[in-house]
Amino acid sequence: RVCMGKSQHHSFPCISDRLCSNECVKEDGGWTAGYCHLRYCRCQKAC
């Protein structure tokens, strides 16, 4: 499943936490994304 995530400045594709970089961590109740910042994957929490 793929959703659209948002950072403070732009949107980016969101992917399953299983596909996210191992340097990222899953946000509680949320999707992880291919864009990582401060070891967290930033994404909206709903599709």
Swiss-Prot record:
GO biological process terms, semicolon-separated: defense response; defense response to fungus; killing of cells of another organism
Matches recorded under InterPro entries: Defensin_plant (IPR008176), Scorpion_toxin-like (IPR003614), Scorpion_toxin-like_sf (IPR036574)
Record Gene3D superfamilies: Knottin, scorpion toxin-like (3.30.30.10)
Keywords, alphabetical: Antimicrobial, Disulfide bond, Fungicide, Plant defense
Disulfide bonds, paired cysteine numbers: 3-47, 14-36, 20-41, 24-43
Superkingdom of the organism of origin: Eukaryota
Signal peptide: none
Family affiliation: Belongs to the DEFL family.
Name of this protein: Defensin-like protein 2
Organism: Zea mays
